[in-house]
Amino acid sequence: MNNIRTIKGGVNLKGKIKVPGDKSISHRALIIGSIAEGETTIEGFLYSEDPLSTADCLRKLGVNIPEIKKDKPFTISGLGINGLKEPKEILNCGNSGTTMRLLMGLLAGQEGKNFILTGDISLNERPMGRVGKPLSLMGGKIFGREKGNKAPISINGNKLKGCVMGTPVASAQVKSAILLAGLKASGTTSVIEPASSRDHTERMLKAFGADITIRGEFGRNVVIKSGGSLIGQKILIPGDISSASFWMIAASIVPNSEVLIQNVGLNPTRTGILNIMNSMGCNYEILDKSTIAGEPIGSIKVKTSNNLKSFIIEGDILPKLIDEIPILTVAACFCNGVSEIKDAQELRVKETDRLKVMARQLQKFGAEITEKEDGLIINGQSKFHSAEVDSETDHRVAMSLAIASLLAKGTSKIMRADAASVSYPTFWEELAKLTN
């Protein structure tokens, strides 16, 4: 990653766009389609590095996935829950934590088969014990560096037993891994979270015919019963609200802007950013609401707002906007008053330490940000000057810095800007279109 982008401040954003397909749903459509019976057709797939890593690993497990082409639907021939093959080579998950953690759950119960998962330098330093430990309690045989916490990860497929599992943090990846393992475990597997996390896995498993029940306060208890089979489906993947968030915030804070973002997923476990935009006093409306394959979608129209209010992010809302914290940090710099992000320790083990990286890079523009162990304190009403900043290889940091550059006086440079392609390959083209 050595690509440099130059961005001129003082321009506005006008126009309408469609953002790429939802990354979370793209991963899950591939994985669940692979273990369903019959064919699954996927439209709106996110053609980017992370979901393509998932596709590559599944091919090595014997799944017939054709070459995926940008903006083209494709069809998977599923192997059924018991049909995955033992691979002849190591499964490389690239930079994708979702790929590695969900595959750990998928493969733990594949009796008598052995698997090795690895990733790039960054992924191999991210914590995997949070998935490995609950799977081990179900009978999984999972090994890795640093007592199973770091990849490369070795999995000896074993007979799993259903159980009731409480997770220490609200994590969709941990929950999803346990639910996928539950498909192969004896009896019933129940996951109880401290707060509700993204529920794309539950919605999709249900659409494919799994015996899954969601109960408890705010849907924090998910129960799956093994023994059934999944049936292939037609999946239309909505636009990713995490990718849309860059334009939603940009149109709110860049003067004289108006942007319409079409066909965005509005799953209530993902719309925390709308709650924060409400408290900021942002000027937006949701149009053309509908539901496709159990996922609510709509278009979001955003206009510039004056006198935005500062905000606090803490507690149960975190899982609903965890990926939007970098761009909300940029927004906070232009609100009135002091904003605070708390309870966000999880960001320290993302692709980078996002708290540290966002503070370090935005300070180069002149932002006043104090880093805390679990978050950030951000002084508003900043006057940004141009700067040379660095994504530090993190896709969400790269795109957040691009939006920050629009509010800086003069011309800024973003180093390693090609990191954006991990989740949004056309980001720079869309930025040029909206600012032209």
Swiss-Prot record:
CDD domains (UniProt xref): EPSP_synthase
InterPro entries: Enolpyruvate_Tfrase_dom (IPR001986), Enolpyruvate_Tfrase_sf (IPR036968), EPSP_synthase (IPR006264), EPSP_synthase_CS (IPR023193), RNA3'P_cycl/enolpyr_Trfase_a/b (IPR013792)
Gene3D superfamilies attached to this UniProt entry: Enolpyruvate transferase domain (3.65.10.10)
Domain of life: Bacteria
Transmembrane segments: none
Residues noted as binding phosphoenolpyruvate in the record, renumbered to the chain: K23, G97, R126, Q173, R354, R396
Residues bound to 3-phosphoshikimate: K23, S24, R28, S171, Q173, D323, K350
Pfam families noted in UniProt: EPSP_synthase (PF00275)
Catalysis: reaction(s): 3-phosphoshikimate + phosphoenolpyruvate = 5-O-(1-carboxyvinyl)-3-phosphoshikimate + phosphate
Keyword annotations: Amino-acid biosynthesis, Aromatic amino acid biosynthesis, Cytoplasm, Transferase
Keyword hit for Transferase: yes
EC number: 2.5.1.19
SUPFAM superfamilies in alphabetical order: EPT/RTPC-like (SSF55205)
Localization (cell): Cytoplasm
GO biological process assignments: amino acid biosynthetic process; aromatic amino acid family biosynthetic process; chorismate biosynthetic process
Main location: cytoplasm
Pathway: Metabolic intermediate biosynthesis; chorismate biosynthesis; chorismate from D-erythrose 4-phosphate and phosphoenolpyruvate: step 6/7
Active site residues per record: D323 (proton acceptor)
GO molecular function: 3-phosphoshikimate 1-carboxyvinyltransferase activity
Purpose of the protein: Catalyzes the transfer of the enolpyruvyl moiety of phosphoenolpyruvate (PEP) to the 5-hydroxyl of shikimate-3-phosphate (S3P) to produce enolpyruvyl shikimate-3-phosphate and inorganic phosphate.
Protein name: 3-phosphoshikimate 1-carboxyvinyltransferase
Organism annotation: Prochlorococcus marinus (strain MIT 9301)
Gene of this entry: aroA
